[in-house]
Structures are given as structure tokens and as C-alpha cells.
């Protein structure tokens, strides 16, 4: 078995190679070939059924330059690359960078040469940049197996003029006019597996220059390098570890990585609401949110009218235990008593700071001001209904506050009457003194007989004409054609003309046409026609 000391070191290869030959016409020609762009890396494309379509080109693509100089020496000669009448092509072959030691048992896989796929031959392109010369470009070279390889380029020439032939044919196996000239090798490059491939770098400036002149070279504007973290024991994964561990590592790299739960950025922020923690049992689900909840509660009533502890809210809409309408505040019966509205309470927010602006009465109802609630004196009595129309002043308006001036409107809960537009009354001045008659408590509150139900404020609106509900007209009301089958050349009768006239109207000055609703109408024409 070969030891590392017995393996010869790989000599450094020259990137420039020259040959000299003399033609039949006694011309002294020098061939100089240079590898301008060396291959660095490649990804193995495999040897399966999809390897031919799954190309993984060598990166960067190899570029070889050729110059032809005529003269006694390279330094004293003349560059005739563009003037020399011949065709050149370069053939690429793949070789192992290090010689493989032969084992005791010769296996078929050990004797097989490495497989190079793609387009291994390239013709010479005459380019002006980076310098005027001939260039061979290999943008489609792929390697099937991973390892360390080198590329060998062999130059062949097809001579066109007889004076440029060799004095003696060099190789008898080649057809006449085709001669092998020289070869050059690249530096070693690595071919990685799909798991270990580091990625592709941005295209080189030489590749961009060649592509700008029309050569088929793929250009990458960004870097596509993988960022891999070093794992313990990754260096000896090929020599050590069993196949199960390698498969597990491969599966871990391919699967989608889910962020850990301890990552603070991956956890969704929880709601700051504590409504679920302070939820009380048997909540009032029938209550609707209203604008009244946005204001502070009104001041408590006088001590003589202190209600039961059950009345703790200003308004309870939809609550079966609460009164349908609040009972007006009761005052002593004093004839000729004048009540002056006082200034707004300090605990109320000013009108300009209210979050709601004053609006007119919606849906055409009369604007009504709801006074502060005053509960019933006795909880056992039924809450009576009373009429609170604007035209009848049967109670004293409350002190001007946000409850009376901000426009809390109430809608009648009688859906049997359609809404009727009513002009909103003029707002009363806040600081004007109004003289009102005394309240009659006996008429407002009766412990025995309930008040009559609320009546509509205006008479019923006149009935509107019926509105046609959207629908389609019948077919026979639009189209006059018959639906019966036609036989023996029969045709539908054209409704635009009479039955006795086929294609013509009875009068030359009059035409008939069918409207969209199925009606037949006529139109008068000018009297310019031949008799």
C-alpha cells in the first residue's frame, strides 16, 4: 500500500505554454496558450437519470487565450492571430489531480475514469477585450462525482492553406488538414457533493467582459454562498461515523428549521387585556353599548329621594328589571314658582371637550332631552309610561349639562309607524330664564292606574306607491317569436314587419322596430326613394 512519502508531489504547472513549428511555406509560427481564468469549485451533478438535465457548471467558467506569432522569436515576432487563415478548437478532458493507489482488489469503479458532462469542446472567439486575441470559453462543464480534479485542454488546428501545412504529418490517425498542436492544464479544483457545496461566488470581471461581447456566459450579480456553522466531528465524518449518522445529518440540514420556543422574537405578544380575568358571573349580555357610558355619572339626588341600592346605573337598555323610562324629578307643589337653570356642575366635562359632537335628531324624530334619572319612591310599584313630547311642558328641564345639551336622542320603540321627517326645534339659550307652571305630581305618578301608552307624535305618513321589486320579465312579453319547431324550410316571422310583407313594411315611409320592453314602435323615414 502506498504511503504518503512515496506519493510524488504534484509539480506546479505553468499557466502559459508555447510551441514552435515551421510550415511548408517556410513560415516560423509560435503558438502561445494561456489559461486566463482557472476553475475553482463545482457541485457534483450525480450519475442518475436526471444528471443530463441537472447541470452544475464549473465555477468560474474556464477561459483560455491563444495567440499566434510569426517571427524568429516571440519577442521579435508579429501577432497574426486575426490574420492567420485557419480554424482552431479546444477539447477539454477531466483527470484526477492526485494519482490513485491501486488496491489489492481491482473493482470496476476504481478503473473507471471520471465522467465529464456538458460541452467539452469550444471554438475560438476573436474578441477585442481584454486584449485582441482568440479566446476559448467553457461555460457548460459539469462533473458527476466529487473529488479533486484538473482540466486538460488540447488544441487542434484545421489548416486551410497548403503553405501552412506541416513539413511532415505528425499524427496519421487524424484526417488530412487536422493537426494536434499542444495542450495545457489547469490548477486543481474541488468538486463537492450537494451537502458540502459552499455555494457560488459573484461572476468575475473577465466573465462579464466576455459576456458583454456576445459570448454565452451566465452572469451572477450577487453572492450565493452558504453560511454553515462548524459541527464537532465534521472533519472526520467521511472516515469515521456510520451511514445512519450521515443520513441523520443530511435530513437535519434539509428539513425546515423551526425557531426555538425560548426565542423572545418568535413568540407572539400576548394581549394586555384582562377582561377574561375580571369577568363576573351572569353578565348582562342583552345590554348594548351606548354613548352614556362615556360620561361620568350624574350627581346623586337629594337625600329625601334616596332610592334603594339596586339603582346604580344611569340607563339600562334592555334590562328587564329596570324601568323603561326614568321617573322625572319630583318637586313640591308651589304655584307661580320660577325655576332658573343653574350653571353646569363642576364634575361634568365642558361641552367643547366632549368626544361627541352635537347632531340633529336622527331618523326624523323629535329631539328630546333626557333628564337625570330619579328612581321610583317605592320599588314595589310598577314603572308607568308617560308621554314626553316637546310640545307639552309637564316637567322641569334639568340643569344644563352634557346630558341635556350634547344631544342624547331617544328613538321610539314602536316599529309599526314609519319614520317621518320632523324639523328639529331651535336650541334654547343656556343662560335664559324660563317661567314654567307648577308640576302636578298626582297626574304624573299614579299608584293605582297606569298611564296610557305612548302615542305617535305625528300622524301616520301617507302611503307610498308600491315599489317594483327587481325581477325578470317573461320571455313572451319581450320576444314575439314562437317557440314551436320549424320544419320544411320554415322561418320565424320577423316582428319588425307585418305578416303579409316579407322584409318590407306596408308603407315605404314608415318602419317598425321592437323596443326593449317588447312593444312594437314605428318610425317615419324621408321620402327620398325611387318610384
UniProtKB/Swiss-Prot annotation:
Residues 430-461 are annotated as: PEST. Residues 348-357, 479-491 have a biased composition (Polar residues). Keywords: Cytoplasm, Nucleus, Sporulation, Transcription, Transcription regulation. Disulfide bonds: none annotated. Residues 26-220 form the Velvet domain. A motif (Nuclear localization signal) lies at residues 40-45. Residues 244-253, 381-390 have a biased composition (Basic and acidic residues). This is Developmental and secondary metabolism regulator VE1.
Amino acid at each position: 500500500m502506498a504511503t504518503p512519502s512515496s506519493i510524488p508531489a504534484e509539480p506546479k504547472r505553468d499557466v502559459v505554454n508555447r510551441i514552435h513549428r515551421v510550415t511548408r511555406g517556410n513560415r516560423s509560427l509560435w503558438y502561445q496558450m494561456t489559461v486566463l481564468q482557472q476553475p475553482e469549485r463545482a457541485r457534483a451533478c450525480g450519475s442518475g437519470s436526471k444528471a443530463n438535465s441537472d447541470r452544475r457548471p464549473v465555477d468560474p467558467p474556464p477561459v483560455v487565450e491563444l495567440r499566434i506569432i510569426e517571427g524568429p522569436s516571440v519577442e521579435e515576432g508579429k501577432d497574426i492571430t486575426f490574420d492567420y487563415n485557419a480554424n482552431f478548437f479546444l477539447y477539454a478532458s477531466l483527470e484526477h489531480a492526485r494519482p490513485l493507489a491501486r488496491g489489492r482488489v481491482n473493482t470496476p469503479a476504481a478503473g473507471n475514469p471520471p465522467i465529464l458532462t456538458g460541452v467539452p469542446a469550444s471554438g475560438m472567439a476573436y474578441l477585442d477585450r481584454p486584449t485582441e486575441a482568440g479566446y476559448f470559453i467553457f461555460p457548460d462543464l459539469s462533473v458527476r462525482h466529487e473529488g479533486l480534479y484538473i482540466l486538460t485542454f488540447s488544441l487542434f488546428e484545421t489548416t486551410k492553406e497548403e503553405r501552412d501545412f506541416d513539413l511532415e504529418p505528425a499524427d496519421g490517425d487524424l484526417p488530412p488538414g487536422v493537426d494536434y498542436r499542444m495542450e495545457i492544464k489547469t490548477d486543481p479544483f474541488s468538486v463537492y457533493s450537494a451537502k458540502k457545496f459552499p455555494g457560488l461566488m459573484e461572476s468575475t470581471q473577465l466573465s462579464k467582459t466576455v459576456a458583454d461581447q456576445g459570448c454565452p456566459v451566465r452572469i451572477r450579480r450577487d453572492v450565493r454562498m452558504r453560511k454553515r456553522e462548524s459541527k464537532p466531528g465534521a472533519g472526520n465524518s467521511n472516515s469515521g461515523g456510520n451511514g445512519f449518522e450521515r443520513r441523520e445529518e443530511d435530513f437535519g440540514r434539509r428539513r425546515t428549521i423551526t425557531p426555538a420556543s425560548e426565542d423572545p422574537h418568535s413568540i407572539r405578544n400576548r394581549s394586555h387585556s384582562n377582561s377574561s380575568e375580571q369577568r363576573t358571573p351572569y353578565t348582562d349580555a342583552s345590554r348594548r353599548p351606548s354613548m352614556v357610558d362615556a360620561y361620568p355619572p350624574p350627581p346623586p339626588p337629594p337625600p329625601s329621594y334616596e332610592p334603594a341600592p339596586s339603582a346604580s346605573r344611569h340607563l339600562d337598555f334592555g334590562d328587564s328589571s329596570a324601568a323603561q323610562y326614568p321617573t322625572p324629578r319630583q318637586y313640591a307643589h308651589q304655584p307661580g314658582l320660577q325655576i332658573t337653570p343653574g350653571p353646569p356642575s363642576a364634575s361634568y366635562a365642558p361641552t367643547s371637550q366632549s368626544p361627541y359632537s352635537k347632531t340633529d335628531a336622527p331618523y326624523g324624530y323629535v329631539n328630546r332631552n333626557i333628564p337625570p334619572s330619579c328612581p321610583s319612591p317605592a320599588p314595589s310599584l310598577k314603572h308607568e309610561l308617560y308621554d314626553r313630547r316637546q310640545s307639552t311642558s309637564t316637567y322641569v328641564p334639568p340643569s344644563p349639562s352634557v346630558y341635556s345639551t350634547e344631544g342624547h336622542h331617544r328613538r321610539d320603540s314602536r316599529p309599526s309607524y314609519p319614520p317621518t321627517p320632523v324639523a328639529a326645534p331651535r336650541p334654547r339659550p343656556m343662560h335664559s330664564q324660563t317661567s314654567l307652571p307648577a308640576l302636578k305630581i298626582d297626574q304624573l305618578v299614579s299608584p293605582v292606574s297606569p298611564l296610557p301608552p305612548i302615542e305617535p307624535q305625528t300622524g301616520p305618513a301617507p302611503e307610498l306607491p308600491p315599489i317594483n321589486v327587481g325581477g325578470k320579465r317573461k320571455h313572451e312579453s319581450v320576444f314575439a317569436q314562437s317557440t314551436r319547431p320549424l320544419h320544411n324550410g320554415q322561418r320565424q316571422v320577423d316582428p319588425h314587419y307585418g305578416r303579409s310583407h316579407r322584409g318590407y313594411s306596408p308603407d315605404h315611409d314608415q318602419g317598425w322596430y321592437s323596443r326593449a320592453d317588447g312593444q312594437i314602435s314605428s318610425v317615419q323615414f324621408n321620402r327620398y326613394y325611387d318610384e
